[in-house]
Structure formats: C-alpha cells, structure tokens
C-alpha cells in the first residue's frame, strides 16, 4: 500500500508524514476538541528529496497540485489559499527565516486555526478567516526565526543518501505511485469518517 511505499522511501519520517496526512483528513473533528493543529515541516538541503516527499503527500489529494513559493506569495494570498479548502493539505515551499513578520505570524496562527485578519463586509470591524486545512512547509532553512513557530511544527529532516540498487527500485516504485495520483486512497479513507469521529471521543 501507499503507507508501505512511503515508509520504504522515508523510514520513520514517512510514517509520521502519513499519520499527519490521515489527521488532516479529519482535521475538523480533531480541532473541535484540541483547538489547535500543528504544521508539517519537511526541511532539507538542496537535493535531499524534500519536494518529492511533499508532492507525494499532495498527490493523495489532487492531480498536479499547485505549490506556492513563500517568498513570492503575499500574506493575503496565503490566507486565501488556506481558506479555499477543508480537511486537505496546502503546501508552501521555500520557507526562509528572512520572511516578513506577517508571513511568520500567519504561519503561527495556522496552529490555532486563525487565518489572516480582514475587514468585515460592513466595514465596521475586523475578523479573522478560519483555517481548516493542514499546512505543509518545505525549505532549506529550519524555521527558527521565531521559536514560537518552531514549537508549532512537526519537524522532519530529509537527508540525502547514496542509493543502492534496491533503494533505487523502491524510489522508482514510489514515483510511479505518486504519478498515478493516488486520490483513491483518500476517498477510501473517508469511508471511516464516522468511525474516526466516534473513536476520537471515546
């Protein structure tokens, strides 16, 4: 299955990421009681496969997913992107500690389900857009610009390693599965929504 494939490729990191994916599917149920939900951060230097890792997780939700570069994505666009979906992953690439305070504050707010602040339709007051998606960030820098942000992420480090013939074969199998756009896995898991809801509150 897909969980075996991702475990073969990424080991314990793959297991953690797959658990995050499942939690994202039922994020609304989880946050009804926890009021918070962490960000998944895949960190790694260039060539370590972090983007391939992230794209596999995104492929579980949609074909040819859009990846937003944080440096060229405004604070407002981040909010709109997160508000568009529910119980689904949103991917922001190229995290850097030099990002603006607004970008960093937005990411911190994701943990508490708070999006960007905007003026209400009547113009009388400001309101925060609610976030109900899982957020995945990737980059070559650890998110240490603000310790409060670092405490809100599940931190996974993607490391480059020399591949044996067997590992290369597993990698090709991994890419093949990703390119098939395995959204059927997500559809299959949604059948267990009622079971998850009941079990979560047991």
How should these model regions be labeled?
Residues 1-5:
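Short, small-residue-biased leader/transition segments that mark boundaries at the very start
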Residues 6-12:
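A short glycine/serine-rich beta->alpha loop
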Residues 15, 24-201:
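Conserved NTP-binding/hydrolysis core of motor NTPases
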